[in-house]
């Protein structure tokens, strides 16, 4: 992005990579895919990708430089830890620039059904039949 920030929605990838959802789709749907390799578990100093200037580190990690899980951490957790109930909603609720506007909402979970409500009003109801909660 022009402002030097990366989106937590994980909709972009470098030319030599792909978004996590693509990996998970292939793992779930193709018998010949036996796993994945995550090159960057933690952000690190150097190789300022996806930016080439005015950046100090890589931004691809699942965990930031301080060891704090990023939003995508919960996406991986929902796939890698089916024995642990994960429900993670992003973005945060107090986005001042978006008051009164439509905001994309992502939910990372192992659950088969998700219902989003605001002030007892149904916003969305999604079923994920391919998910098998443990």
Go through each PLM region and give its residues:
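Extended substrate-binding grooves/exosites of carbohydrate-active enzymes
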Residues: 1-129, 134
């Amino acid at each position: 992005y022009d402002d030097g920030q990366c989106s937590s929605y994980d909709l972009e990838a470098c030319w030599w990579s792909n978004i996590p959802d693509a990996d998970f789709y292939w793992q779930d749907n193709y018998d010949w895919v036996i796993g994945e390799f995550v090159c960057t578990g933690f952000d690190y100093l150097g190789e300022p990708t996806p930016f080439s200037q005015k950046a100090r580190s890589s931004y691809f990690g699942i965990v930031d430089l301080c060891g704090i899980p990023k939003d995508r951490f919960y996406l991986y957790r929902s796939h890698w830890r089916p024995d642990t109930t994960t429900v993670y909603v992003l973005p945060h609720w107090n986005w001042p620039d978006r008051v009164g506007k439509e905001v994309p909402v992502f939910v990372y979970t192992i659950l088969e059904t998700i219902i989003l409500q605001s002030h007892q009003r149904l916003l969305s109801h999604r079923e994920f039949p391919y998910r098998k909660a443990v």
